[in-house]
Swiss-Prot record:
This is Ribosome-binding factor A. The keyword Cytoplasm applies. GO terms for molecular function: ribosomal small subunit binding. One of several proteins that assist in the late maturation steps of the functional core of the 30S ribosomal subunit. Associates with free 30S ribosomal subunits (but not with 30S subunits that are part of 70S ribosomes or polysomes). Required for efficient processing of 16S rRNA. May interact with the 5'-terminal helix region of 16S rRNA. Belongs to the RbfA family. It comes from Synechococcus sp. (strain CC9311). Pfam families: RBFA. GO terms for biological process: maturation of SSU-rRNA. InterPro entries: KH_dom-like_a/b (IPR015946), RbfA (IPR000238), RbfA_dom_sf (IPR023799), Ribosome-bd_factorA_CS (IPR020053). It is found in: Cytoplasm. Monomer. Binds 30S ribosomal subunits, but not 50S ribosomal subunits or 70S ribosomes. SUPFAM superfamilies: Ribosome-binding factor A, RbfA. The gene is rbfA. It comes from the Bacteria. Keywords: Cytoplasm, Ribosome biogenesis.
Length: 134
């Protein structure tokens, strides 16, 4: 159980430090193309591998540029994380584009459209009472 807590702590620290490095440490302009945020960090039990999930707000071309920039900065980030976290061996980093927020926004948009259509048709919505038929 202590091993699990350590992995969680390391993941939280990696998320914090990587967020800081995204703002102040990486000079590659590609990384600053869109609004970039780290949504999740997964670290293997042996602390040798790390998946960092990134959400990028912007067009697909901007997302591609940001991911290319992050890929190019992987070695720098790994070295900085090893130094900042004082780890003997920093984990190997893999960046993954997280589309969860984008998918959630799409679902909310679709639900809004359905609600507007229902209102236009005059359909009965949840919470309204049906007229009594004697």
């Amino acid at each position: 159980m202590a091993q699990g807590r350590r992995v969680e702590r390391v993941a939280a620290l990696i998320r914090k430090e990587t967020s800081e490095l995204l703002i102040h440490g990486i000079r590659d302009e590609r990384v600053h193309q869109g609004m970039v945020s780290i949504t999740e960090v997964e670290v293997s039990g042996d602390l040798q591998h790390c998946r960092i999930f990134v959400s990028v707000f912007g067009e697909q071309a901007q997302k591609d540029e940001v991911m290319d920039g992050l890929e190019a900065a992987r070695g720098f980030l790994r070295g900085e994380l090893g130094r900042r976290l004082q780890m003997r061996r920093a984990p190997e980093i893999v960046f993954k584009l997280d589309l969860g927020i984008e998918k959630g926004t799409t679902v909310l948009h679709l639900l809004g459209e359905l609600e507007r259509e229902r209102d236009e048709r005059g359909d009965v919505t949840e919470g309204t009472e049906l007229p009594d038929n004697p």
